Amino acid sequence: MQLILLSGGSGKRLWPLSNNARSKQFLPLLEKENGEMESMAQRVVRQAQEANLTNDITLATNASQLDIIQNQLGERVSVVTEPERRDTFPAIALAASYLKLKKKCEDDEVVVIMPCDPYTELEYFHTIARMVECVEKSVADLVLMGIKPTYPSAKYGYVVPFAEGEKYQIVKRFTEKPDVPTAEKLLEEGAYWNGGVFAFRLGYMMQIVRKYMQSENFEDTRARYSEFPKISFDYEVAEKAESVAVVPFNGEWKDLGTWNTLTDELHHASIGNAVMGSHCENTHVINELQLPLYVDGLKDAVVAASPDGIFVCAKKYSEDIKKAVEHLTPRPMYEERRWGTYRVIDDSEYADGNHSLTKSITLKPGKNISYQLHHHRSEVWTFVEGEGIFVLDGEEKHVKAGDTVVIPLEHYHAIKAITQLTFIEVQNGNPLVEEDIERFDYQWKMK
């Protein structure tokens, strides 16, 4: 079977730790049994493999998350990037096309779709295995996981089944995010939460894809991505399907999409360079800054600090953060890339119209930044840790801590780390945008 993990979101509910380039599923805040920290996405991939579900995992995402996925998950997953953010149906249609046209999977291959960030237990993945079994036995064209509700929630859609069955039930109808009184009635009917987990044969999905697009290769499908309707998978596929079954799951399952739910699962009250006084109660502090953070006298609160900003809030109001930060600058102040990380130290505009941006950039040993040039900015790099190989217009030289290099406007350049390499980059120009970059192939000579 093939597992497709959906990774979307713009990262505003867990601001300031999450942003457009580092959504909630990539925050390394969950502690493993050995004490190491991992992200929600890393946890889900690990659990799927520990449950012997499959090693054929494809992650469907947007281009802005590609580097952090490669950094955290490496070769454990294949990645399909959508050209633009649309909705779950086009994302799943593109991923299914990748399996069919790129990986050459057969039509009878079972495909499972699930979010990449549920906080759950191994039994969840054993339930997925039972869903696969239902598809293989042709119980229904489409099989869903039904989460046993713990309370009448207005945040989730509901799946209403016919009479109870031991292993699965035939679906009677769907109800989208009702009000609480309606949710109470749905629970009386034996309804489940729709957890966004679906199983089907690849051929079933490709029949739906071909209603919108006839294509013989994946590259063409991706280029024509905008031809898919901007609609959810639930509306376009699940609610129109003639044969749908649900497999129940009654275990630990949470959406850690808010500060309130996330802090419930943190093993420590403080993470990072933070000190909590003795008068704090049910308060969590996360500090990604190098500056120390001291907190005392807070009750039922969350404090989070990152290069993107500082957040102090009572937990019961923390869900309001999404609307509050919509107007803030879209430039991420911290990003994980395939080669390492960068952190914005200063971003200044001057009276003469010039703009400067200062970053601290760290490369992992053996990794390199692509051979590139910029049309609107010059750069000065000062190396503060490690050693590497710097190239300017095809000329390579060794660099180490204490060295400085100047990169004029429209000159080709790159850097490769020998050891862990950290340098301070000062950009000058206008406009200073990440899109001001042209990348080129380059064969390194020195080692």
Q: Where are the language model's segments positioned?
A:
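Short coil/turn connectors at secondary-structure junctions
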Residues: 1, 54-55, 75, 107-109, ...
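Conserved N-terminal catalytic core of the sugar/cofactor nucleotidyltransferase
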Residues: 2-5, 15-20, 28-115, 119-125, ...
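Catalytic metal- and UDP-sugar-binding loop of GT-A-like glycosyltransferases, i.e.
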Residues: 6, 114, 383, 426
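Short N-terminal binding/cap micro-motifs at the start of the first secondary-structure element
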Residues: 11-16, 23, 434
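Residue-level signal for inorganic ion chemistry
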Residues: 41, 95, 117, 159, ...
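Conserved core of the sugar-phosphate nucleotidyltransferase
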Residues: 121-225, 245
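Left-handed beta-helix
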Residues: 202-406, 411-417, 431-432, 437-446
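C-terminal structural segments of small proteins and small subunits
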Residues: 424-432
